[in-house]
């Protein structure tokens, strides 16, 4: 799984306003066939970006949340459609959530994305 790196890619995903939300996680998604113009249309495979704001906590806390999200995204990436961009956004409560809870939420979100995009493939 590749990473979303550029601001343009993040904005493209967030602009589409397609998302799935749980207690501590919001998953924004964009199918590559949704993109009309831009560099994103030429990319194949899944790409994931992380958005953890200062509202989540200090730098140490934010980095811990990002590490957890990366591990969980790798674990459940097979649930996602082949050609999509995902932005995982942490809600402030994610800092206090235990790993098992985050794992269940991530699996649930990725399943929901898969269901919502199944008709498009």
Swiss-Prot record:
Q: Name one GO molecular function term.
A: 3'-tRNA processing endoribonuclease activity
Q: Does the keyword Aminoacyl-tRNA synthetase feature in the UniProt annotation? A: no
Task: Enumerate the Pfam families for this protein.
Answer: Ribonuclease_P
SUPFAM superfamilies membership: Ribosomal protein S5 domain 2-like (SSF54211)
Q: Which residues form a coiled coil?
A: none
Tell me a GO biological process for this protein: tRNA 5'-leader removal
Enzyme Commission number, as recorded: 3.1.26.5
Give the function comment from the record. RNaseP catalyzes the removal of the 5'-leader sequence from pre-tRNA to produce the mature 5'-terminus. It can also cleave other RNA substrates such as 4.5S RNA. The protein component plays an auxiliary but essential role in vivo by binding to the 5'-leader sequence and broadening the substrate specificity of the ribozyme.
The record's comment on protein family reads: Belongs to the RnpA family.
PANTHER family from the xrefs?
Answer: RIBONUCLEASE P PROTEIN COMPONENT
Q: Which HAMAP family match?
A: RNase_P
> What is this protein identified as?
Ribonuclease P protein component
Q: Which organism is it from?
A: Bifidobacterium adolescentis (strain ATCC 15703 / DSM 20083 / NCTC 11814 / E194a)
- Its gene name is rnpA
């Amino acid at each position: 799984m590749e990473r979303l790196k550029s601001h343009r890619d993040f904005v493209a995903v967030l602009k589409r306003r397609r998302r799935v939300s749980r207690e501590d996680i919001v998953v924004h998604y964009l199918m590559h066939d949704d993109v009309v113009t831009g560099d994103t249309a030429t990319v194949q495979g899944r790409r994931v970006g992380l958005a953890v704001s200062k509202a989540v906590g200090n730098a140490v806390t934010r980095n811990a949340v990002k590490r957890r999200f990366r591990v969980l995204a790798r674990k459940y990436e097979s649930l996602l459609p082949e050609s999509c961009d995902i932005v995982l956004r942490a809600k402030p409560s994610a800092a206090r959530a235990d790993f098992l809870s985050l794992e269940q939420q991530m699996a649930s979100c990725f399943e929901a994305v898969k269901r919502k995009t199944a008709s498009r493939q």
